[in-house]
Structure formats: structure tokens, C-alpha cells
Regions:
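C-terminal regulatory/oligomerization modules of transcriptional regulators
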Residues: 10-12, 111-135
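Key DNA-contact positions within bacterial/archaeal DNA-binding proteins
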Residues: 52, 107
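N-terminal helix-turn-helix DNA-binding core of bacterial DNA-binding proteins
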Residues: 16-49
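Short, small-residue-biased leader/transition segments that mark boundaries at the very start
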Residues: 1-5
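Basic, amphipathic "hinge/linker" alpha-helix immediately C-terminal to the N-terminal HTH DNA-binding motif
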Residues: 73-91
Length: 135
């Protein structure tokens, strides 16, 4: 039982860590559409996090080759980082829209979409996408 529990905890940690990374990448994408340059302080302000927490996350994203950080501290998505961010952003937008069409309050729909976007399978998302676009 101990090993199974440890594996489950590890899986949950990895999933949450991945979700966190995806949220940061999505935030960088959104900010890059609004601002001329994106810095750690912009991300911290947008998410309401401490700059130190964001700095740790940026280090991790840089090590995964999802972002580059210039000497001036400007953060840019790499091609792989942009692909992940755009996938998450598309999921978020479509799932929010779907939930709102079902009568869910806009704020609740956005919060729920933010949770669902990280765990939904590609197959389920594509099925929802096809259904929404038929309507």
C-alpha cells in the first residue's frame, strides 16, 4: 500500500506541476498579446503571485526549453512553449464558451475551464470542439 500511495502522490504532484507550468505559459501568451515585453513582475501581477515564486517557475520553464529570458529580463515563449500555451488557451476559451452556453455564470465557467483544460484528453476536447462548431 505504501508504494501505491507514493506513486499516486507523485502522479498528483507531477500533474499539478504540469498544470502550474501550463498556467504560466498561458499567462505569458496572454500578456505577450497585451504588452510590448513580458517580465516576471508582469506575470506576478497578473497571477497575484510573489515575484520570487514566479522567478522559480521561470527557471523551470527555461530548463524545459519552454521560454527564453533575455539579459534585460524579457520573457519569450519558445516554439514548444508557444504550442503548449496556445493549446491551453484554445481549450480555456472553448470550454468557457461551452459552459456559458449551458447557462453557467461567466466567472464560474472561466474557473471551471481553467481546471478542466489541463486534464481533458485530446479526443474529448476535439469532440467538444466539433460539437460546439456545429451549433
Amino acid at each position: 500500500l505504501g508504494d501505491v500511495y507514493k506513486r499516486q502522490l507523485t502522479g498528483v504532484f507531477e500533474m499539478r506541476n504540469n498544470e502550474s507550468s501550463e498556467n504560466y505559459l498561458e499567462t505569458i501568451l496572454i500578456l505577450s498579446k497585451k504588452l510590448p515585453v513580458v517580465r516576471s513582475v508582469d506575470i506576478a501581477n497578473e497571477l497575484g503571485f510573489k515575484k520570487s515564486s514566479v522567478s522559480i517557475a521561470m527557471k523551470n520553464l527555461r530548463e524545459k526549453n519552454n521560454i527564453t529570458v533575455s539579459d534585460a529580463g524579457f520573457i519569450t515563449l519558445t516554439e514548444s512553449g508557444r504550442q503548449i500555451a496556445e493549446m491551453i488557451y484554445e481549450r480555456h476559451e472553448l470550454l468557457s464558451e461551452c459552459l456559458e452556453k449551458l447557462g453557467v455564470d461567466k466567472e464560474i465557467a472561466a474557473e471551471d475551464a481553467c481546471r478542466i483544460e489541463h486534464v481533458i484528453s485530446p479526443e474529448s476536447f476535439e469532440a467538444i470542439k466539433k460539437h460546439i462548431h456545429k451549433s
